[in-house]
């Protein structure tokens, strides 16, 4: 892994302290009122916000994180914070800016999360049984894929979009694997097939109870599309 990508992964770890034509139950996972792959300024424009209306935690050529604390209504309920996270996947350093890869929404403790869940079901279909996400950093000395699986429960609903395995042409799988290793710590030729089977272009989570999802103390929604952005970047690099 080159030093630039290692730096990006480290920054993302700190910032996190976080298909077209698919069936009804697998609708494309899109962020509210904006789109994946958009820059900070494009997301702000979509949300009709100026820079002085948001908290900018970090903004570099590699990554960015901004928060909106204006009690915006998202999925039918008022929020207490909306966090947007951005990453630059261009390895050459010649082009590219950080683009939207994750949205994490915190709701007040008294928010009606049943309403939030129903609104998400309208957009994304029925909850899946489970989803798997992969972190962009590893514990010191750990060479395994940093893999986390979240299962549907009374206080947790999960959604996923198109699987990576379905998106990658079978005759190009080896080429994608070689390129993808630079973007995913712990990825090897040996675990590539399993990774593609479990990885979705984008995922979403709706948590409605204490410790239902590690990122939130209680109520929250997390949407993440890092794999989908890497897929588009790798595909573009192959042209």
Show where each model-derived region lies:
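Positively charged n-region of N-terminal signal peptides that target proteins for export
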Residues: 1-5
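Residue-level signal for mature regions of secreted extracellular proteins and peptides
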Residues: 12-13, 199
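C-terminal motif of bacterial Sec signal peptides marking the signal peptidase cleavage site
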Residues: 15-18
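Non-cytosolic coordination micro-motifs
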Residues: 23-65, 102-239
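Compositionally biased P/S/T/G-rich terminal and signal peptide-adjacent segments
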Residues: 42, 48, 52-95
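Short, solvent-exposed coil/turn segments at beta-strand boundaries
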Residues: 87-100, 124, 220
């Amino acid at each position: 892994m080159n030093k630039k990508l290692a730096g990006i992964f480290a920054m993302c770890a700190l910032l996190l302290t976080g298909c077209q034509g698919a069936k009804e139950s697998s609708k494309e996972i899109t962020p509210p009122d904006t789109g994946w792959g958009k820059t900070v300024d494009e997301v702000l424009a979509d949300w009709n916000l100026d820079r002085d209306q948001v908290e900018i935690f970090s903004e570099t050529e590699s990554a960015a994180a901004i928060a909106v604390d204006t009690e915006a209504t998202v999925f039918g309920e008022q929020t207490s914070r909306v966090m947007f996270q951005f990453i630059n996947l261009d390895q050459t350093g010649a082009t590219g800016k950080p683009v939207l890869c994750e949205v994490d929404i915190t709701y007040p403790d008294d928010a009606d999360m049943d309403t939030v869940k129903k609104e998400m079901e309208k957009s994304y279909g029925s909850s899946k049984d489970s989803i798997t996400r992969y972190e962009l950093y590893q514990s010191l000395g750990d060479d395994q894929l940093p893999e986390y699986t979240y299962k549907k429960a009374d206080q947790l609903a999960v959604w996923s979009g198109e699987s990576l395995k379905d998106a990658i042409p079978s005759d190009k799988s080896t080429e994608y694997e070689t390129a993808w290793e630079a973007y995913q710590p712990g990825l090897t030729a040996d675990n590539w097939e399993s990774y593609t089977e479990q990885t979705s272009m984008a995922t979403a989570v709706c948590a409605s109870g204490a410790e239902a999802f590690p990122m939130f103390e209680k109520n929250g929604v997390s949407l993440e599309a890092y794999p989908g952005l890497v897929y588009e970047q790798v595909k573009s690099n192959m042209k």
